[in-house]
UniProtKB/Swiss-Prot annotation:
<feature type="active site" description="Proton acceptor">
    <location>
        <position position="12"/>
    </location>
</feature>
<dbReference type="InterPro" id="IPR010049">
    <property type="entry name" value="MTA_SAH_Nsdase"/>
</dbReference>
<dbReference type="GO" id="GO:0005829">
    <property type="term" value="C:cytosol"/>
</dbReference>
<comment type="pathway">
    <text>Amino-acid biosynthesis; L-methionine biosynthesis via salvage pathway; S-methyl-5-thio-alpha-D-ribose 1-phosphate from S-methyl-5'-thioadenosine (hydrolase route): step 1/2.</text>
</comment>
<dbReference type="GO" id="GO:0009164">
    <property type="term" value="P:nucleoside catabolic process"/>
</dbReference>
<feature type="binding site">
    <location>
        <position position="153"/>
    </location>
    <ligand>
        <name>substrate</name>
    </ligand>
</feature>
<feature type="active site" description="Proton donor">
    <location>
        <position position="198"/>
    </location>
</feature>
<comment type="similarity">
    <text>Belongs to the PNP/UDP phosphorylase family. MtnN subfamily.</text>
</comment>
<keyword id="KW-0486">Methionine biosynthesis</keyword>
<feature type="binding site">
    <location>
        <begin position="174"/>
        <end position="175"/>
    </location>
    <ligand>
        <name>substrate</name>
    </ligand>
</feature>
<dbReference type="InterPro" id="IPR035994">
    <property type="entry name" value="Nucleoside_phosphorylase_sf"/>
</dbReference>
<keyword id="KW-0028">Amino-acid biosynthesis</keyword>
<feature type="binding site">
    <location>
        <position position="78"/>
    </location>
    <ligand>
        <name>substrate</name>
    </ligand>
</feature>
<protein>
    <recommendedName>
        <fullName>5'-methylthioadenosine/S-adenosylhomocysteine nucleosidase</fullName>
        <ecNumber>3.2.2.9</ecNumber>
    </recommendedName>
</protein>
<comment type="function">
    <text>Catalyzes the irreversible cleavage of the glycosidic bond in both 5'-methylthioadenosine (MTA) and S-adenosylhomocysteine (SAH/AdoHcy) to adenine and the corresponding thioribose, 5'-methylthioribose and S-ribosylhomocysteine, respectively. Also cleaves 5'-deoxyadenosine, a toxic by-product of radical S-adenosylmethionine (SAM) enzymes, into 5-deoxyribose and adenine.</text>
</comment>
<dbReference type="InterPro" id="IPR000845">
    <property type="entry name" value="Nucleoside_phosphorylase_d"/>
</dbReference>
<keyword id="KW-0378">Hydrolase</keyword>
Length: 231
């Protein structure tokens, strides 16, 4: 099995990159691909760049050029579930766009035309994520809906909009729905496993930039355990 792993930013993939044996790096269309073995498994680690277009381009190349069998999306996310704290893990059951609106044509809010309203994460990959979680000491995780948009959600108004239209949302970020839609169109299984870097409506002593390395450490640990279980 060849495992595709996607992170948007250098900070989100750096720990995983350091652990790859036989590392080879290529760049195409602004996307950086690191290939080799991780914990004995064949992997392709993609640094896609930030946002949905970059993520869709990178995921397309990951699947079409590198022929990965599964896709794991890692990195950071903003927490919307009240039980979440910095460093906790979120596991997708489904992913939706929060900034798509073609409701004038009878679609649901967040549903892109001619696409499903939600992109379901693969059941087997979710089970692997759950098993990996049991190997992490005292790590809290929440499973559920992750929403994506091309905006860093930091205003009360935008938070309220997302909550009103997607009341079950547990976290938001900027790439997962594009990755999920691309995987859907290629019939490639995916799951999103991210760590919380900030939480809506909660004060934090650290800024997003300060906590990002810690979130990356948490999500990378989870991914490495999943890779070991998948190989």
């Amino acid at each position: 099995m060849k495992i595709g792993i996607i992170g948007a930013m250098e900070q989100e993939v750096a720990i995983l990159k350091e652990q790859i044996n036989g590392l080879a790096t290529t760049i195409k269309a602004g996307c950086t691909f690191h290939t080799g073995t991780l914990n004995g498994a064949e992997v392709v680690l993609l640094q896609s760049g930030i946002g949905k277009v970059a993520a869709a381009v990178g995921t397309t190349l990951l699947i079409s050029d590198h022929n990965v069998d599964v896709v794991l999306n890692t990195g950071s996310a903003g927490g919307f579930d009240s039980s979440l704290n910095l460093g906790d893990v979120v596991i997708s059951t489904e992913v939706r766009h929060h900034d798509a609106d073609v409701t004038a044509f009878g679609y649901e809010m967040g549903q892109m035309a001619q696409q499903p309203a939600a992109f379901k994460a693969d059941e087997k990959l979710m089970a692997v994520a759950e098993k990996a979680l049991t190997q992490m000491e005292d790590k809290h995780a929440v499973r559920g809906l992750i929403c994506t948009g091309d905006a860093f959600v930091c205003t009360p108004e935008r938070q309220a909009f997302i909550r009103s239209h997607f009341p079950s949302v547990i976290a938001v970020e900027m790439e997962a729905s594009a990755i999920a839609q691309t995987c859907h169109q290629f019939s490639v299984p995916f799951v999103v496993v991210r760590a919380i870097s900030d939480v809506a409506d909660k004060e934090s002593p650290m800024s997003f930039e300060e906590f990002l390395p810690l979130a990356a450490e948490s999500s990378s640990e989870m991914v490495m355990k999943m890779v070991t279980l998948l190989k």
